Amino acid sequence: MAKGIRDKVVILGAGCSKFGERWDAEPADLMAEAFEECLADAGIEKNQIQAAWQSTGIDAFSVGPGAMPLSIALRLPYIPVTRLENYCASGTEAFRAATYAVASGACDIALAMGFEKLKDTGYGGLPQRSRGVT
């Protein structure tokens, strides 16, 4: 008998875009690159995904509003896509939400994707007020 989440959820696959100063790559290109690698690693088709979570650390930088950038870039079928924003913990939040969705039985296959493209923004770190500086 299952005692916890670890008995109800598995990670089917993972993917990552290439690191580096990729000035020529749009955010959608990087998301699609990681997604294709993830699908290949998992051995599934994108139409098997039943829900998705997109995470980004800070809304103000290059990704776009809401969860539409993920849905459009990956050409996901008509599934619920939720956007999460929680600074450096954003990826963990997306992973946790997808894990709980599967563990609860709300879906069988869920996608969690974290994304940032800060090099194009000139962003140099956390805003001053989040570091306690006034």
Describe each model-derived feature in a short phrase.
Residues 86-116:
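Active-site-proximal alpha-helical scaffold in enzymes
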Residues 1-82, 103-104, 112-134:
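Conserved "HGTGT" condensation-loop signature of ketosynthase/thiolase-family condensing enzymes
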